[in-house]
Structures are given as structure tokens and as C-alpha cells.
């Protein structure tokens, strides 16, 4: 029988971290620092390292100390306490992911599934055909009414948001003049949407599919070359497709409150982007191609795992005046080290002063954009 090498046994220790009603088993080196341990716990718990307090035998462990120096050995049980707000993604992972506290409104509270669907009469369909606008939000619909499909190619706007619709069929391609499509708040899954139909809408400028249950966006999205606004907030997306870079007319991208871990480098091709919101995701870095977004004015990255930014972001993105980095590992002091920061700071202060001059609500307090030293 082969004997276990005692040096190997000493090279790792097995410990348990208790957090949010669950026990997290870990095998780590005794020479691992408490700071390194916190970094390992970040993707497991979604709590940023600076928001973690590790407690062993009633004492808070010091970040710079090793586990050996802290008398943490095999079999040790640590407790993790999380500071409120200091998390990436939607929040700390508590117990099992299936009962994770997600603040996602899939269907509006105003919609009662027990109520009958809105009646589609001739007056309504005549109005649809005359205006090209089909408005059926919060109509308690289980499916898209047949009368909608009878409206022909003149339809410019279709709003079927906040219903209970479970299928968007391929025949939506018949609306060749469609410019705006609102599908948010229906609980749509990946299987619910026949993407080849939507992808054929070459004139589509606005697509809202927020507050659904999508886990992936298909490569067919790249066919929507007229798209200017894309809202995929509050889904379960883990990535954005590489074909995002084909949406060269895109001006607004809202993808906050998902589970996105990385971004395609092709996003740099979306040179008209003015507003990007990626808050409450699990992103740890931005591609350097972000510096190609010369029209970027607003970039929201709050509650992510970011530790740094593209080195030339402030130098190259000369329109940037709003930056949100609260509850990340990036501090104001860190930002000030970047080339071009002073010019960026001047732009955002000028914007803030204009808001004060025009008495914009909520503009009374100047926002530094990131947290101060911690």
C-alpha cells in the first residue's frame, strides 16, 4: 500500500466557512493570507473582499496574516460576516442558488393572472392599422392575439410588455417596418423566443427584453444592425455574444442585474455607444477595447467585481462624464492615478453644476463616482 507523503498533507488545510445559512468547505495552503482567502470566497459568496469579515474563535482575522499565523488549521470553522451593499451581482449568495434573494420583477404587480385578457375588438384593430402602434402592455395576455398578426407590415411599434406571454413566434418577421419592440416582464425563457423572427427585423431600433428569464443571447442578435437601444436588464445572462460588435449603431446598452462574468472585445466596435449600464454583474475586468468608445458619456459599473479599468479609459473616452463604481474594489484614490482623470473630473463637475443651475431633482450632492478609501 502506498503511504501518504506527510509533506503533502501539511501543504493544505481543510476548513469550513459558514455564511448565509450554508457551510462552504475549502482546501487552502496554511501560508495563504486572510486577504487571499477572501478573494477565493468572492466568486462563491458574491461578497467583495473588502466587505468580508472572517471571524475565528471570536476574533476578526487580520488581512495580512497567514492562516498559520492566525492559528487556523485543518478542521477550523470560520464565520463570514458581510457588510451591507459591498457585493457583486445581485447580492450575496445565501444557502442554495435556487432560493437566492433576487430582486427581479418578472411580471408587474399590476397584472392579475386571474383577470380576463383584454378584449381585442374591431375598433382597436382599426386603430392599430391606422397608427402602426400596437399597445397591449399589462393586458393579461397568455399569448399574442391573432388579431395582431392581421395588422400587416405597417406595424412600427409592438408593446406586449408585462403580460404572461410564453412564446414569441418566428412570424413576427412579418412586421418588416418594426422599429420598437417591448417584450419586458413576461417571464420569457430561452426557448420562448424564435430569434430568427426577431433577427429579421432590419429596421428595429429599440428592443426591450428586460425582466425575463433569459440565460443567453443568440449570435443572431448581430443581424439587428439598426438597433440603437438594447435593454436586457434583470435576466440571468452570463455573457453577451461576440456579435454584439456588429451593432454599430447602438447608443444605449442596459445589461445590469444579470450574472455576466465577461464582455466581448468586439464591444469596442459599437462606436456610437453613449450609455452603458453593467451594474450588479460578476464582471472582474473590462476589455481594453472599451477605450474605442469615443462617444461614451455614462458608464455604470456599481456592484461588480472590478478591481481596475482599461488603462487609457479617461485618456481616450473624452465624452465620459458619469462613472459609477460604488461597491467595487476600485476607490476614488485609485481612479486619481489614471492618466486623463483630471480632465474627466472637470467634465463631471461641470455636468453637476449644470444640474444645479437647472435645479435637476437629486443633483444637490456631488457624487464622486466611487467609494473612498476603505
UniProtKB/Swiss-Prot annotation:
Keywords: Leucine-rich repeat, Repeat
Location of the Ubiquitin-like domain: 13-87
Keyword Repeat: yes
Record InterPro entries: Leu-rich_rpt, Leu-rich_rpt_typical-subtyp, LRR_dom_sf, LRR_domain-containing, LRR_R13L4/SHOC2-like, Ubiquitin-like_dom, Ubiquitin-like_domsf
Renumbered ranges of LRR repeats: 128-151, 152-175, 177-200, 201-224, 225-248, 250-270, 272-293, 294-316, 318-340
Annotated protein name in UniProt: LRR repeats and ubiquitin-like domain-containing protein At2g30105
Native source organism of the sequence: Arabidopsis thaliana
Amino acid at each position: 500500500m502506498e503511504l501518504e507523503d506527510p509533506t503533502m498533507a501539511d501543504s493544505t488545510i481543510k476548513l469550513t466557512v459558514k455564511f448565509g445559512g450554508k457551510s462552504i468547505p475549502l482546501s487552502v495552503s496554511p501560508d495563504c493570507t486572510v486577504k487571499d482567502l477572501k478573494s477565493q470566497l468572492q466568486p462563491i459568496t458574491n461578497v467583495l473582499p473588502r466587505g468580508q469579515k472572517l471571524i475565528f474563535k471570536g476574533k476578526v482575522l487580520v488581512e495580512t496574516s497567514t492562516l498559520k499565523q492566525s492559528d487556523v488549521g485543518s478542521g477550523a470553522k470560520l464565520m463570514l460576516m458581510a457588510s451591507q451593499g459591498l457585493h457583486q451581482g445581485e447580492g450575496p449568495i445565501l444557502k442554495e442558488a435556487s432560493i437566492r434573494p433576487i430582486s427581479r420583477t418578472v411580471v408587474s404587480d399590476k397584472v392579475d393572472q386571474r383577470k380576463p385578457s383584454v378584449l381585442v375588438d374591431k375598433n382597436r384593430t382599426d386603430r392599430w392599422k391606422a397608427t402602426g402602434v400596437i399597445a397591449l402592455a399589462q393586458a393579461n395576455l397568455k399569448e399574442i392575439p391573432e388579431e395582431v398578426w392581421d395588422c400587416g407590415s405597417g406595424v412600427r411599434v409592438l408593446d406586449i410588455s408585462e403580460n404572461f406571454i410564453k412564446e414569441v413566434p418566428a412570424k413576427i418577421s412579418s412586421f418588416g417596418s418594426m422599429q420598437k419592440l417591448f417584450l419586458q416582464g413576461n417571464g420569457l425563457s430561452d426557448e420562448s423566443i424564435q430569434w430568427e423572427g426577431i433577427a429579421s427585423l432590419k429596421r428595429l431600433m429599440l428592443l426591450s427584453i428586460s425582466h425575463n428569464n433569459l440565460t443567453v443571447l443568440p449570435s443572431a442578435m448581430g443581424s439587428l444592425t439598426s438597433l440603437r437601444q438594447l435593454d436586457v436588464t434583470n435576466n440571468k445572462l452570463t455573457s453577451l455574444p461576440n456579435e454584439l460588435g456588429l451593432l454599430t449603431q447602438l447608443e444605449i446598452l442596459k445589461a445590469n442585474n444579470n450574472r455576466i462574468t465577461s464582455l466581448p472585445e468586439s464591444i469596442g466596435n459599437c462606436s456610437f455607444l453613449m450609455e452603458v449600464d453593467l451594474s450588479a454583474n460578476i464582471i472582474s475586468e473590462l476589455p481594453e477595447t472599451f477605450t474605442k468608445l469615443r462617444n461614451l458619456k455614462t458608464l455604470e459599473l456599481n456592484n461588480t467585481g472590478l478591481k481596475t479599468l482599461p488603462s487609457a479609459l479617461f485618456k481616450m473616452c473624452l465624452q465620459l462624464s458619469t462613472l459609477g463604481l460604488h461597491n467595487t474594489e476600485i476607490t476614488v484614490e485609485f481612479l486619481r492615478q489614471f492618466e486623463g482623470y483630471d480632465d474627466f473630473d472637470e467634465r463631471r463637475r461641470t455636468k453637476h453644476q449644470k444640474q444645479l443651475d437647472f435645479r435637476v431633482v437629486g443633483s444637490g450632492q456631488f457624487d464622486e463616482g466611487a467609494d473612498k478609501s476603505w
